[in-house]
Curated annotation (Swiss-Prot):
Reactions accelerated catalytically: succinyl-CoA + glycine + H(+) = 5-aminolevulinate + CO2 + CoA
Name this protein carries in UniProt: 5-aminolevulinate synthase, erythroid-specific, mitochondrial
Segment annotated as transit peptide: 1-18
Metal-binding as UniProt keyword: no
GO biological process: erythrocyte development; heme biosynthetic process; hemoglobin biosynthetic process; protoporphyrinogen IX biosynthetic process
Positions annotated as active site in the UniProt record: K323
Disulfide-bond pairs as recorded: none
N6-(pyridoxal phosphate)lysine PTM sites in chain numbering: K323
Pfam families: Aminotran_1_2
Record CDD domains: KBL_like
Enzyme Commission number, as recorded: 2.3.1.37
Keyword Nucleus: no
Gene label: ALAS2
Function: Catalyzes the pyridoxal 5'-phosphate (PLP)-dependent condensation of succinyl-CoA and glycine to form aminolevulinic acid (ALA), with CoA and CO2 as by-products. Contributes significantly to heme formation during erythropoiesis.
Amino acid sequence: MAAFLRCPLLARHPPLARAFATGARCPFMGFAHRAAPELQEDVERPQIPAVEVLEELLRDGGAALNRTVRDCMDEDAFPYEEQFQAQLGALRRTHTYRVVTAVGRRADAPPLGTRGTAPHTSVELWCSSDYLGLSRHPAVLRAARAALDAHGLGAGGTRNIGGTSPLHGALERALALLHRQPRAALFSSCFAANDTALDTLARILPGCQVYSDAGNHASMIQGIRRRGVPKFIFRHNDPHHLEQLLGRSPPGVPKIVAFESLHSMDGSIAPLEELCDVAHAYGALTFVDEVHAVGLYGARGAGIAERDGVQHKVDVVSGTLGKALGAVGGYIAGSEALVDAVRSLGPGFIFTTALPPQRGGGALAALQVVGSAEGAALRRAHQRHAKHLRVLLRDRGLPALPSHIVPVRWDAEANTRLSRALLEEHGLYVQAINHPTVPRGQELLLRIAPTPHHSPPMLENLADKLSECWGAVGLPREDPPGPSCSSCHRPLHLSLLSPLERDQFGVRGAAAG
């Protein structure tokens, strides 16, 4: 009855009987009259503990879990399930089917984690992209908790509709300053940042051509493909091939040259200045993905461009909050007009919920750590441990590539077998990297990511156990180990260990250096 009395139409009809009669003919009030008590705002909701609700959902959902997409269709409909199973079968036959390993990272004891019911309930994590361990840094956690208490769990909307907090603006300004660019824009992930920025730029630049490195990440490839513009693939990190391709384009045509400063899988570092100089000589914008370099290179942790002193030659830089900075999210930085255009016209920025404020608070604190003396010390320790591990692996005749990401390359089947053996037999979690993350034929046995929190004994143990599993699987070794990588022929820089580092790492590291 209270609902009827609040209706502006029925308020003009005081007699209750007449009000009910009118309400029966009103579509809105008729619905209110028939509504169940649970839908009425003045009915108290039962207080059921969230755990009991979840248990009830899981208990009652068993039947629904067994349904297929064909259950509500005629027999002559397309065989959807069979097609799905055929695709999955092909992955299993080529040893590229993805099995997710559930590991709970321990914030109190990096780089350890837990596996629950597995034989080794405690595991060492060797494939995390939390390169510096900042996701559990006390200052980062305090800032994230403070933002959570102040603003709640979610952003509450898109950036344009109620989802922009003061923390979003502060983080964008800090990221722009980090890369010495006028402006930055945050995205839900760096996949979204690359995809949206490249797609939007290709759309708004008339007749745009895109020149893409052959090793680019899937997010860049998707953004380039989405618009269907003319695209040209240059050999990985090859400025001479890039120049050959650019030389065929008319000078007045807008062009974008897109590449990664540090390759996400093999860890190779691009000749950044040379690529930028070639691009600018032919009037092309440079779009540089610094995802795996931010926080790890440069005096302030801005990446390879800062390390090489060429930040001014990068027109658009993309980065992530989710690796060395220990948070979640992505961003681009560039000129005021360029970033504003992507922000104003990019669907991946406009039509998605903004990053939660606590992510911004935590990321701001992580940036402060990265730019401090502590951050510089973490970067030194990170690089030192990567060098040490390469020494140990090469000593054992294992084909390690030269990078802070230490990939050990072999075929897909061996990838899976060795990764499983390391985890199940020794409690060492190193993920095999297979197609489509890398092209067929370029599968990486292990993508090892040592951190400052892996101790020298941990590095020794990993090398010993990997060597043991390598022999058990029957894989050949490189004997004697050469001074350069057998895959890319780049020097391994084993001699870069300082006397202090050699003393710390013992006889093996010193002898190999």
